[in-house]
């Protein structure tokens, strides 16, 4: 049996990234959580952006946990802010790092599963431009395994 080489692709915080892109925001630097805020704060968040995770928020928290953690972070920011006063807020990581007087804020985006499925299908079409469908193994809406064995072997000759 010959060895096979696989490539694993897992799109970074997929639902949160889609929501950021829809808003013209950078998914790596924007504080965003995907959750149905019309339900109680006990609702489970579908996704948390990488920037918001950097404050110690896990990937699938309940919404009240996000609210609580951001309050804790802002309490600490206020203690360190000039005059111990927060003068505004931002959802942007760069602005928050540059200005200690800003409170951490975040966007709550309602889930849009049908839209995420459409975006996932568009991404799959990109894979198909370069990889045969039989070599793409879909694991989930944002993860695939690609059998790259035959593509790599042609590089050796």
Language model segments and positions:
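Gly/Gly-Pro- and Ser/Thr-rich, intrinsically disordered tail segments characteristic of DNA damage-repair
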Residues: 1-156
């Amino acid at each position: 049996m010959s060895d096979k080489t696989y490539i694993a692709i897992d799109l970074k915080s997929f639902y949160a990234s889609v929501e950021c892109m829809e808003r013209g925001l950078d998914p790596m630097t924007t504080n965003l959580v995907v959750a149905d805020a019309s339900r109680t704060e006990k609702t489970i968040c579908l996704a948390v952006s990488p920037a918001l995770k950097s404050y110690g928020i896990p990937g699938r928290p309940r919404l009240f946990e996000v609210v609580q953690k951001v309050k804790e972070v802002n309490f600490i920011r206020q203690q360190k802010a000039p005059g111990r006063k927060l003068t505004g807020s931002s959802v942007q990581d760069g602005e928050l790092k540059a200005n200690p007087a800003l409170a951490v804020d975040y966007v709550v985006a309602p889930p849009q599963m049908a839209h995420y499925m459409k975006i996932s299908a568009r991404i799959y079409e990109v894979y198909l431009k370069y990889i045969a469908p039989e070599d793409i193994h879909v694991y989930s809406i944002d993860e695939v395994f690609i059998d790259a064995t035959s593509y790599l072997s042609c590089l050796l000759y």
